[in-house]
């Protein structure tokens, strides 16, 4: 997504190494070529995506030692689904969904799914599985600041 408040921009500041590719879901051949080129150096990338055949968080925890890359699709739910369904390569990856108990903090973002997460929130949920010492509040602090800025930009309703 190319929105100035895109949460992937915050990820670039917080994570290293991170590889971000901009995909056009309207051209399946180009989409697959870019994904193939990006993932060719990895032997067992895992996709974090709530597809119909995605495994749950417990299965993800059991796979933590066997993967060498995590793949997240950033964008609106409509765009993310389109990228997933246009890419035969992404559909072949082992995919996992994150079972969450709380709604997203990103209230400004609209989603048709009740318990959908922004990309940075999904990354944070997965990182919590890796490291017992992972401080998700510290990791998400720039995201919380971004939300605060966005809320301040919304015109106040007159009473």
Please annotate each region the language model reported.
Residues 2-4:
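Short N-terminal binding/cap micro-motifs at the start of the first secondary-structure element
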Residues 9:
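Active-site phosphate/pyrophosphate- and oxyanion-stabilizing loops and adjacent acidic/basic residues
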Residues 6, 54-58, 115-121:
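Secondary-structure junction/capping motif
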Residues 69, 78-159:
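C-terminal folded domains that constitute the principal catalytic or ligand-binding module
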Residues 14-85:
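S-adenosyl-L-methionine/SAH cofactor-binding core of RNA-modifying enzymes
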